[in-house]
Amino acid sequence: MDNARMNSFLDYSIINGETGTCSSRSYHADQGITTYQSCAVSNNNCNADDRYIVSRSVQIGAPPPHHHHHQSNYTHPNNLGISYSAHPNCGAGYPAQSFNTGYSHHYSLNQETDGNGGYPQCAPAVYPGNIASAISPHHHSYGGMVGSGQYPHHPYGQEQQGLALAAGCHSLSPVHGSHQEACCSPSAETPPPAQTFDWMKVKRNPPKTGKAGEYGFAGQPNTVRTNFTTKQLTELEKEFHFNKYLTRARRVEIAAALQLNETQVKIWFQNRRMKQKKREKEGLTSASPATPGSEANTEDTSDKCNSTSSTPSPSSSTSETINTSG
């Protein structure tokens, strides 16, 4: 095969959609950039989805905006077999068509530009497109959607197809791909359920063990009972005789005079009132009970009367002196 034949490429397009015949045209590659026109087979009796197209994948280098010199090396490793099977809804007059193509291109472009240097070679990519869409000259490989048919067997193997699909879907940089996998992997994992330990539980205070009195708890179980002196009890009894209920100012005054605190004076008056009510219920006291203070007052008044009666009056003493003189 001569160089002129190697530097040319084949363009297959179906001319007649009814008979399914294909015609091939050869073009001479001047710039070294190969373009492929998509071809489709559509029968009048078939559905709208019956479209057949060949997906190709090649290895390209990014073309610069200005081209000065291109060196293209084309190799034809083997022929790519493409077979089209007739749709079951089609008539019997359209048999299966098959033809062989010889442009499974694997080439490299060495380009010289006016810029800082050459462009790195990109990974193989597959560009999906429609059947009648215009393909840019920069897109060296493309693939179409296949409705119902057979995919052609690529000579590069399944591994290269997987790499091409992965490169087409994701970014061409492998660093970006690994970073994306690292970012997506933690979100896929579900966090384990939180485990509750004994030390995390709330510890509540135990109930009070003190004896409940008649009117609730008398205080903390370790509280020492107050022992009042005779003088303190006497002053408290005197105050209770005049006022059964104390104001806060009077309570503070009595506590300061008896060297007690307000709580002790308050509790004593509460207990004294309850004791008085209990005595009234039992009938030990009359309706107008005599308090020790009143009894002391009556005794004082009686003593005063006796003392005044025992002492002689001035009138009697004068009369006695007159009788003695007469």
From Swiss-Prot:
Q: Where is the composition biased (Low complexity)?
A: 306-326
The protein's predominant localisation is: nucleus
GO molecular function list: DNA-binding transcription factor activity, RNA polymerase II-specific; RNA polymerase II cis-regulatory region sequence-specific DNA binding
This one is known as: Homeobox protein Hox-A1
Q: Does the keyword Protease apply?
A: no
CDD domains documented for this protein? homeodomain
The short sequence motif called Antp-type hexapeptide sits at 196-201
Which InterPro entries does this entry report, sorted A to Z? HD, HD_metazoa, Homeobox_CS, Homeodomain-like_sf, HXA1/B1/D1
Q: Which family does it belong to?
A: Belongs to the Antp homeobox family. Labial subfamily.
Q: Which gene encodes it?
A: HOXA1
What Gene Ontology cellular-component terms does the record carry?
A: nucleus
Stretches of Polar residues bias are at: 285-296
Q: Where is this region: Disordered?
A: 273-326
Q: Which UniProt keywords apply?
A: Developmental protein, DNA-binding, Homeobox, Nucleus, Transcription, Transcription regulation
Give the UniProt subcellular location, in the record's own words: Nucleus
DNA-binding region residue numbers: 221-280
Q: Which superkingdom is the protein from?
A: Eukaryota
Function statement:
Sequence-specific transcription factor. Part of a developmental regulatory system that provides cells with specific positional identities on the anterior-posterior axis. Acts on the anterior body structures. Seems to act in the maintenance and/or generation of hindbrain segments.
Matches recorded under PROSITE patterns:
HOMEOBOX_1, HOMEOBOX_2
